[in-house]
């Protein structure tokens, strides 16, 4: 990996990326309300479970395959698989989340003129666009490899979940850093599992997350949009 590719992925994984990630908890807040999360240890366990049991089987392998589609510029496969991912979201909140963040990232890519004109036209035609599809586009535009792209995406997800824990539990900054450090190995394992997953084995089945997300839609007091 070149320094330019590394910096591009650090940019994409940054919480400063203006796509609204900070406003979503992906069910974390609902799990807290259900008393599944109570402290730093249970927050770490919840985030670890989401990474190894959900992302590693669904979002990360999907991202890897979309990255390959962008490198090959297979517009038909991109559209078909993007539509499948959007349809796989199990609640209105989770669907709005991936659509809003995907749209914001796609707009950013277009405004910064990342990628060639033909691929930018394909990107613009994907409506709605899921976040992993847009993230894969941005990574492909910088010639990033699959392993580093997935690691950046997974780290950004862990960091955002940890940020939600700091605000909602609440936890201190040191407790949050301990969670991130504790999950470094899990990120590596999740990436390896995702890279070994063929397209027909991508699995987004996560009933507990779907139920909690649906409950969050009518939760009395909320900090986050999901």
From Swiss-Prot:
Q: Where are the transmembrane segments?
A: none
Q: Which Pfam families match?
A: UreF
Keyword check for Ribosomal protein: no
**Which terms are listed as keywords in the entry?**
Chaperone, Cytoplasm, Nickel insertion
InterPro entries named among the record's database cross-references: UreF, UreF_sf
Q: Does the keyword Chaperone apply?
A: yes
**Cellular compartments annotated:** Cytoplasm
A single Gene Ontology molecular function, please?
nickel cation binding
Q: Name one GO cellular component term.
A: cytoplasm
Query: Which family does the record claim for this protein?
Result: Belongs to the UreF family.
Quote the subunit structure annotation.
UreD, UreF and UreG form a complex that acts as a GTP-hydrolysis-dependent molecular chaperone, activating the urease apoprotein by helping to assemble the nickel containing metallocenter of UreC. The UreE protein probably delivers the nickel.
Its annotated function is as follows: Required for maturation of urease via the functional incorporation of the urease nickel metallocenter.
UniProt name for this protein: Urease accessory protein UreF
Q: Please report the organism this UniProt entry assigns to the protein.
A: Burkholderia vietnamiensis (strain G4 / LMG 22486)
